[in-house]
């Protein structure tokens, strides 16, 4: 049975070698300096099944976190959902947020973009740039990220039906600017089943829509390995009337 001191000597030490602890005082409101880890061992209980049931931070099954030192080393990425009007306007907003200390970007697209329509399509009238940024072309995507280092920030894009096309535009912009795809980090929502059940922003029938999602799963890890190819959105399904069990499923 592995003990707490084993984890500190092995996993935690290796984690700190990669990302040292943040230069702040890790103390509670009662001015207590907490240990990097607490287990049943701290109250005198040696549970032989603990490692299998809960595990340790940075180790399978990752119940206690995917990194050994977790937020002692690096806080979670903080990104405000942002996007409105034109690509120029949203680019200006992105730069303002990054200057203020934001550590990632989260792109809000307008309804025509979410539905796969160009801004000049008749059905787009009155909706262009209203609830997010309008992106109809590669040129729009270039403007959207002009002056932003795509290897230094991660980008989350709340896009589903046209996710593969929008992501392709993003990667094309990165390639044109000379960035290495293997260093790019980010997320595409890409949860098309949520669209059919809840949000209703779908373009194609379920079967070909799911096939497009699968295509990103197959191609992505080989070419953009640090990217998250789906963000499952159970929240929307619950808001549309599902039970908690259906949301989880």
Question: For each of these PLM feature ranges, what is it?
Answer:
Residues 1-249:
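Catalytic alpha/beta active-site cores
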